[in-house]
């Protein structure tokens, strides 16, 4: 098939799909850094935060934000409490740019901030915000119980 002919195109089976496959961290670096910055780990290394916005380069890569501009068009992950049926739950919502990247998003739960498990429950399918970014929502598996006040925590863990 001729991929330059729009008649041969079809909708992606994934929200944010990319016909070229996933973007590597090195490809992303070459888009956002210039010359010596690309090979300087103190500027473009995965754990560095050159724009001082609280997101290191790997998180910026995974979420699709710009590492040299601290005014992000994609909001930071947010925690909120919401009612689901008769119960109240802790939720996390995060947004990322479309396109495949070599990164995984794990929403993890903990009762002590030491031991983390992949037990969060995804709520519905991913959706798109008005800018075309992908929104994903998870909730803590157990409802918030006013009586026993067992602590519960959620975090977004981004890994390769």
Regions inferred by a protein language model and the residue ranges of each:
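Residue-level hotspots within well-ordered secondary structure
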Residues: 68-160
């Amino acid at each position: 098939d001729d991929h330059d002919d729009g008649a041969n195109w079809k909708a992606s089976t994934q929200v944010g799909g990319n016909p070229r496959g996933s973007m590597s961290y090195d490809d992303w670096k070459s888009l956002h850094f210039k010359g010596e910055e690309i090979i300087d780990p103190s500027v473009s290394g995965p754990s560095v935060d050159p724009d001082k916005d609280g997101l290191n380069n790997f998180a910026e890569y995974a979420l699709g934000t710009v590492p040299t501009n601290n005014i992000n068009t994609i909001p930071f992950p947010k925690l909120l409490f919401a009612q689901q049926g008769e119960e109240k739950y802790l939720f996390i919502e995060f947004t990322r740019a479309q396109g495949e990247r070599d990164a995984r998003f794990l929403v993890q739960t903990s009762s002590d901030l030491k031991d983390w498990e992949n037990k969060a429950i995804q709520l519905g399918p991913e959706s798109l915000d008005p800018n075309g970014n992908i929104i994903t929502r998870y909730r803590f598996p157990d409802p918030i119980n006013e009586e026993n006040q067992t602590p519960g925590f959620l975090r977004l863990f981004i890994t390769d």
